[in-house]
Curated annotation (Swiss-Prot):
Modified residues annotated as Glutamic acid 1-amide in this record: E20
GO molecular function: toxin activity
Any one GO CC term of the record: extracellular region
Subcellular location: Secreted
Record's keyword terms, sorted: Amidation, Secreted, Toxin
Family: Belongs to the cationic peptide 04 (cupiennin) family. 04 subfamily.
UniProt-listed Pfam families: Cu (PF17563)
Organism the protein comes from: Cupiennius salei (American wandering spider)
Protein name: Short cationic peptide-4b
Tissue expression from the record: Expressed by the venom gland.
Length: 20
């Protein structure tokens, strides 16, 4: 199932947005 991969990408994306 891809949920874990997608979740990781989403977390990475959100984390980068919050860092800016």
């Amino acid at each position: 199932f891809l949920a874990k991969k997608v979740a990781k990408k989403l977390v990475s994306h959100v984390a980068q947005k919050q860092l800016e």
